[in-house]
Amino acid sequence: MIGKLTGTLLEKNPPEVLLDCHGVGYEVNVPMSSFYNLPAVGERISLLTQFIVREDAQLLYGFATAPERQAFRALIKITGVGPRMALSILSGMSVADLAQAIARQEAARLVKVPGVGKRTAERLLLELKGKLGADLGASHGPAVSGAQADILQALLALGYNDKEAAAALKALPAQVEVSDGIKWALKALTK
């Protein structure tokens, strides 16, 4: 198994990179989160890798961080999720966002990733529940209860990210009804 490659970056063609390691060029598929953080062509880089052997191909997948590779490994263990879909998921959302979506059982966030349908999202939630978040140190967001939890869910469903939703919640009074809280939070977010 090839666990890590260090060498000179020769080409960058999303989602693939060509890495020269002592005269041998390795084609490595990387998620877009890693791709955007790559240095310029000609620079030295290190990628953690996952080597996949299929009947018709031998493929290398590279990751800038260990949590990305760990999430990839967890994803490809799920029935119906191959390396391409796992790469697409990691390109569509960060590892922390994925772990948070799993912890909160938010299928809607997973369905937004290209190639992930409702059934696949539900399978991901079921099979990764309790596995991904603990391993990757996912935060479960701000501690909220009652009406604030409903307001938070509404803001996330409207497409606001966790930071924006948490900031809007902090600005609300402690005892607020859901409908009023959503209105106030939306006003705060549009400023």
UniProtKB/Swiss-Prot annotation:
Top-level taxonomic group: Bacteria
InterPro entries associated with the record: DNA_helicase_Holl-junc_RuvA_I, Hlx-hairpin-Hlx_DNA-bd_motif, NA-bd_OB-fold, RuvA, RuvA_2-like, RuvA_C, RuvA_C_sf
GO terms (BP aspect): DNA recombination; DNA repair
Role this protein plays: The RuvA-RuvB-RuvC complex processes Holliday junction (HJ) DNA during genetic recombination and DNA repair, while the RuvA-RuvB complex plays an important role in the rescue of blocked DNA replication forks via replication fork reversal (RFR). RuvA specifically binds to HJ cruciform DNA, conferring on it an open structure. The RuvB hexamer acts as an ATP-dependent pump, pulling dsDNA into and through the RuvAB complex. HJ branch migration allows RuvC to scan DNA until it finds its consensus sequence, where it cleaves and resolves the cruciform DNA.
Sequence similarity: Belongs to the RuvA family.
UniProt note: domains: Has three domains with a flexible linker between the domains II and III and assumes an 'L' shape. Domain III is highly mobile and contacts RuvB.
Chain spans, region Domain II: 65-140
Region (Domain I): 1-64
Protein name: Holliday junction branch migration complex subunit RuvA
Residue segments, region Domain III: 143-191
Organism the protein comes from: Verminephrobacter eiseniae (strain EF01-2)
Stretches for region Flexible linker: 140-142
Assembly, per entry: Homotetramer. Forms an RuvA(8)-RuvB(12)-Holliday junction (HJ) complex. HJ DNA is sandwiched between 2 RuvA tetramers; dsDNA enters through RuvA and exits via RuvB. An RuvB hexamer assembles on each DNA strand where it exits the tetramer. Each RuvB hexamer is contacted by two RuvA subunits (via domain III) on 2 adjacent RuvB subunits; this complex drives branch migration. In the full resolvosome a probable DNA-RuvA(4)-RuvB(12)-RuvC(2) complex forms which resolves the HJ.
Subcellular location field: Cytoplasm
Protein's gene: ruvA
Keyword Repeat part of the UniProt annotation: no
